């Protein structure tokens, strides 16, 4: 048996086409063009690449997108002032501070300086609190877990009663992913580096989400026959003198037992960017008093 390889790129491309129509109609019907500002502090090459990809996607859709480039030496207080200026600019609907930031800057302070209505990453304490108290419809949800859930629902619509295991407990993926799965009436277990007998937990999973940041961590013997496996990891390794990206799952082996599995690259990554665009549209509509517009185009 080989699993169904779930192309996040193909699903994200379909979402992109839908969003382009939505944005075009939003302009015509409401004279509204969603605007995303990405704040990039320093010149980290990986961050620059991520930002370029986000901006390219936004422009393809017809969003207004700009990058605010700031030196790595900027003071924390100056960065906070820049964010306040964006918070107070009614033409800006989404603000994203590309992580990581330099060590002298308090990441959590910066995240919570962003107006929660413009926090398209979904990391502000207010958005986190709303998600964890069952108010998904009244907050901006982190993009990667949102993309993962959408992928899972392309495989099976009814998740109620499923056993789901999330490997990883980060604020960015693990915790919100568990929360979203709970919202679908799954029985959710979160495992992590201190979990005893971790493979035993994984073997119970109908849905297994790996977000641990360790190359090929999840082995064939850990996976239930017919499980859905979502691989969030993207790890750079060198193999036979060649650099490549691999996930947190041993794809070649686990693909033999899973009913569906996401590849790396081309799995979760494109979905993260697609849902950043989704959040930007939601933020723009909410700030403009336009409710339920995106839901006419995309089933969230």
UniProtKB/Swiss-Prot annotation:
Catalyzes the oxidation of 5,10-methylenetetrahydrofolate to 5,10-methenyltetrahydrofolate and then the hydrolysis of 5,10-methenyltetrahydrofolate to 10-formyltetrahydrofolate. Keywords: Amino-acid biosynthesis, Histidine biosynthesis, Hydrolase, Methionine biosynthesis, Multifunctional enzyme, NADP, One-carbon metabolism, Oxidoreductase, Purine biosynthesis. It comes from the Bacteria. Belongs to the tetrahydrofolate dehydrogenase/cyclohydrolase family. NADP(+) binds at residues 168-170, 193, 234. It comes from Ehrlichia ruminantium (strain Gardel). Pathway: One-carbon metabolism; tetrahydrofolate interconversion. GO terms for molecular function: methenyltetrahydrofolate cyclohydrolase activity; methylenetetrahydrofolate dehydrogenase (NADP+) activity. GO terms for biological process: L-histidine biosynthetic process; methionine biosynthetic process; purine nucleotide biosynthetic process; tetrahydrofolate interconversion. It catalyses: (6R)-5,10-methylene-5,6,7,8-tetrahydrofolate + NADP(+) = (6R)-5,10-methenyltetrahydrofolate + NADPH; (6R)-5,10-methenyltetrahydrofolate + H2O = (6R)-10-formyltetrahydrofolate + H(+). The keyword Transmembrane helix does not apply. InterPro entries: Aminoacid_DH-like_N_sf, NAD(P)-bd_dom_sf, THF_DH/CycHdrlase, THF_DH/CycHdrlase_cat_dom, THF_DH/CycHdrlase_CS, THF_DH/CycHdrlase_NAD-bd_dom. This is Bifunctional protein FolD. NCBIfam families: PRK14187.1, PRK14188.1. Homodimer. Its EC number is 1.5.1.5, 3.5.4.9. Pfam families: THF_DHG_CYH, THF_DHG_CYH_C. GO terms for cellular component: cytosol.
């Amino acid at each position: 048996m080989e699993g169904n390889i779930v192309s996040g790129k193909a699903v994200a491309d379909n979402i992109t086409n839908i969003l382009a129509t939505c944005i075009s109609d939003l302009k015509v019907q409401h004279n509204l063009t969603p605007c995303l500002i990405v704040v990039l502090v320093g010149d980290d090459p990986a961050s620059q690449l991520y930002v370029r990809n986000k901006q390219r996607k936004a422009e393809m859709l017809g969003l207004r997108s700009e990058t605010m480039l700031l030196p790595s030496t900027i003071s924390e207080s100056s960065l906070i002032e820049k964010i306040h200026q964006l918070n107070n600019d009614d033409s800006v609907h989404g603000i994203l501070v590309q992580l990581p930031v330099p060590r002298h800057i308090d990441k959590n302070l910066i995240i919570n300086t962003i107006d929660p209505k413009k926090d398209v990453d979904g990391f502000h304490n207010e958005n986190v609190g709303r998600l964890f108290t069952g108010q998904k419809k009244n907050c901006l949800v982190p993009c990667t877990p949102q993309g993962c859930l959408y992928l899972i629902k392309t495989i099976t619509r009814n998740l109620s009663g499923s056993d789901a295991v999330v490997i990883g407990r980060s604020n960015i993926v693990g915790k919100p992913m568990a929360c979203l799965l709970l919202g679908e009436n799954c029985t959710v277990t979160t495992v992590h580096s201190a979990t005893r007998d971790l493979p035993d937990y994984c073997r119970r999973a109908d849905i297994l989400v790996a977000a641990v940041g360790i190359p090929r961590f999840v082995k064939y013997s850990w996976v239930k026959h017919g499980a859905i496996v979502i691989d969030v990891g993207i790890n750079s390794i060198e193999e036979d003198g060649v650099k490549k990206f691999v996930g947190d799952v041993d794809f070649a082996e686990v693909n033999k037992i899973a009913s569906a599995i996401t590849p790396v690259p081309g799995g979760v990554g494109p979905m993260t960017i697609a849902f950043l665009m989704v959040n930007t549209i939601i933020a723009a509509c909410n700030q403009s008093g336009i409710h339920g517009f995106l839901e006419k185009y995309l089933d969230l």
